[in-house]
């Protein structure tokens, strides 16, 4: 059974994922560190798992829990690289799907930017997340959900 796991510490599309999976039979798990604790109540198909605040603790838990039938939503290229061959789909919150063809280029870009920062340089960060970005993500996730439902 398909399950969506969200790297929930900084994910701007949590509510969209919850709304789009309601009554689909797809369960959602939001994994967050305790520093992002929330009392927010979610529908029955959604669970929240909290982990320690250590570096990459959320990532390690996602790798541990994910299976071949899962969809993982993360903006972390390093985590995505560990999962592209392990899970069904790895998505960015911009709607793009990570795969073995594009992940190396993304990791290389991350490395180059880290080297620039290490030398005191700066590089342009990502633009602010917009309503249009959210709409693009929702359309991408809906396509994924429909594809999965066709396979079931």
Swiss-Prot record:
Superkingdom in the source lineage: Bacteria
InterPro entries xref list: UPF0178
One Pfam match: DUF188
Family: Belongs to the UPF0178 family.
NCBIfam families linked to this entry: PRK00124.1
PANTHER family in UniProt: UPF0178 PROTEIN YAII (PTHR35146:SF1)
Protein name: UPF0178 protein SaurJH9_0705
């Amino acid at each position: 059974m398909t399950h969506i796991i969200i790297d929930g510490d900084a994910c701007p599309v949590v509510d969209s994922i919850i709304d789009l999976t309601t009554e689909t039979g797809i369960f959602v798990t939001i994994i967050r560190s305790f520093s992002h604790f929330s009392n927010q109540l979610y529908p029955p198909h959604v669970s929240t798992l909290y982990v320690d605040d250590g570096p990459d603790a959320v990532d390690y838990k996602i790798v541990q829990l994910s299976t071949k039938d899962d969809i993982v939503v993360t903006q972390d290229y390093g985590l995505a690289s560990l999962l592209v061959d392990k899970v069904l789909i790895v998505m960015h919150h911009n709607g793009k799907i990570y795969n073995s063809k594009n992940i190396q280029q993304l990791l290389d870009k991350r490395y180059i930017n880290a080297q620039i920062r290490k030398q005191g340089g700066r590089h342009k960060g990502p633009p602010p997340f917009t309503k249009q970005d959210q709409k693009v993500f929702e359309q991408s996730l809906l396509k994924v959900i429909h594809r999965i439902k066709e396979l079931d």
